[in-house]
Swiss-Prot record:
It catalyses: a ubiquinone + NADH + 5 H(+)(in) = a ubiquinol + NAD(+) + 4 H(+)(out). The chain crosses the membrane at residues 1-21, 29-49, 54-74. This is NADH-ubiquinone oxidoreductase chain 4L. Keywords: Electron transport, Membrane, Mitochondrion, NAD, Respiratory chain, Translocase, Transmembrane, Transmembrane helix, Transport, Ubiquinone.
Length: 93
């Protein structure tokens, strides 16, 4: 069980690193969010082993977040032509 705690904390910290350091592309931000939600799932599994419904709820929320991120990525790609954060922040003039 100790390795699952370590893996959860490692995934959450790697997700934070990806979000704060590799934020040039929108896809990198979404991958960082997914890593953080996977780390949260591991940590929740360690601390709440008897509460299987809560683990399923967190997993369901992570899947919903991933589908919303994918829809946003497709929408941004259609509107701007790329997934660079600089193209989202420019005013277009």
């Amino acid at each position: 069980m100790v390795w699952m705690k370590f893996l959860g904390v490692l995934l959450m910290s790697m997700g934070c690193f990806v979000i704060f350091r590799m934020n040039k592309h929108l896809l990198c931000l979404f991958v960082g969010l997914e890593m953080m939600s996977l780390g949260l799932l591991f940590v929740t599994h360690v601390f709440l082993m008897n509460q299987f419904w809560l683990i399923l709820l967190i997993l369901c929320l992570a899947v919903c977040e991933a589908s919303i991120c994918l829809a946003l990525l497709v929408m941004v790609m259609r509107l701007c032509g790329d997934d660079l954060m600089s193209s989202l922040l420019s005013d277009g003039s």
